[in-house]
Amino acid sequence: MFFERSEIKLALGCLLLAFPDYIAAFESDEYHWLNETYQQFIIDCIVRANEYLADPDTAQLRTWVRTRGIAHHSLKEPTDYTFSGLLYQLFAFEPFRSILSTPMDTGVRDLRPTRNLALLTQLVGKFEYLNKVMVLSPKQFKGKRQVDAMSERLFNLYFRLLWDGGIGEYEDDSEYAPSGCVSFMTIHQSKGMEFPIVITDSLSSVPRKQEDKLLTDILES
């Protein structure tokens, strides 16, 4: 799934760490109403980011995360960027820089992280459009600083709903069986194709009965 990809967890984890007030509220159980499984997902993202940032070679990214976190905690004036702007800044560092530098003529397997990061920026951009987020501001918005209210809405509502609904990873519709990947197909999709190994499921199942008894009685009368 999209949200289980390593590059997505790392990107979201770094983004979360850039908002220490959200992290503090999360750790103090202010968001206790969140689904436990989703809470664990948030924790996994934070742990993934912390583990990566612990590497001495990630000093530049670690400095960026810390600088942004301090700035957002003590925000006095509106920023000249939004959440998507933060993502673009984040992508200037490794490993995102290398991922986004992958040649577009490589296979689907190698391009998947690139496509997933592109989809993440689209999702964040759509959130900003729907919520009219033009800046991150310390001004009051519904009883909280706008930067805090919007970060909560982004992580606790928007991403939660997307995570709960499920988002598929990038797939190339023109390539049913890319090298190094396992294809999941319907019987209709697989017609006329040959594979060295085929696994089928539910062979003993039968189609669901969806007949309308009232309609059947009318037709038979």
Question: What residues fall within each predicted segment?
Answer:
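Accessory C-terminal helicase-associated subdomains
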Residues: 52-189, 193-194, 205-218
